[in-house]
């Protein structure tokens, strides 16, 4: 379904652009947290540590221990730890979608190749420094970094999931 239609006017031509957004605005996917939220960084370009970079997801501040749930049905396709980036993280794959949940407390609630359902408890928000002394990725504090990828392309999570009211 075509969700947006924009016309951009240049000095010498008109360019029409249709932006395709899958029809998933009917709550096929859910927000991964079931409590109040505070968005600290949106998808797109941002300045962090004095440098401009592209942020591939949505950062939402929460207290350490806040539960994180699967946004969709799917399969656990990756579980890992990245000291310089995501910290503890889990990827759930569903059709051509991948949902990444990062800076988690641990990854023990699910195993690789597990089938999960929308609302399945995946983990909880982890601290900046994990109990083993390792940094929980590139983080300035406790938060969930949440990504949506479609056909392995980074997409704005807010195009697919409505924020809780």
Predicted ranges, named:
Residues 1-28, 165:
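N-terminal secretion targeting segments of exported proteins
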Residues 51-52, 104, 136:
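Short, solvent-exposed loop/turn segments at secondary-structure boundaries
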Residues 75, 102-109, 159-165:
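A short, sequence-level motif marking secondary-structure junctions
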Residues 16-88, 95, 117-118, 158:
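Surface-exposed, glycine-biased beta-strand/turn segments
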Residues 58, 92-111:
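Active-site region of chymotrypsin-like
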Residues 88-91, 114-165:
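Conserved, short, structured surface segments that act as functional micro-motifs
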Residues 43, 64, 80, 105-108, ...:
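A generic structural motif
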């Amino acid at each position: 379904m075509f969700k947006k239609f924009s016309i951009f006017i240049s000095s010498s031509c008109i360019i029409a652009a249709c932006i395709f957004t899958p029809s998933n605005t009917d709550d096929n996917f859910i927000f991964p947290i079931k409590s109040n939220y505070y968005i600290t960084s949106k998808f797109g370009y941002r300045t962090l540590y004095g440098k401009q970079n592209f942020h591939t997801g949505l950062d939402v501040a929460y207290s350490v221990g806040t539960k994180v749930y699967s946004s969709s049905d799917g399969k656990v396709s990756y579980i890992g730890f990245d000291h310089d980036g995501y910290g503890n993280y889990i990827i759930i794959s569903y059709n051509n979608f991948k949902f990444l949940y990062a800076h988690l407390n641990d990854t023990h609630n699910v195993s690789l190749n597990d089938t999960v359902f929308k609302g399945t408890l995946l983990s909880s928000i982890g601290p900046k420094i994990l109990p083993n002394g390792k940094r929980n990725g590139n983080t300035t504090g406790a938060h969930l970094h949440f990504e949506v990828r479609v056909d392995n392309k980074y997409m704005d999570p807010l195009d697919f999931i409505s924020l809780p009211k």
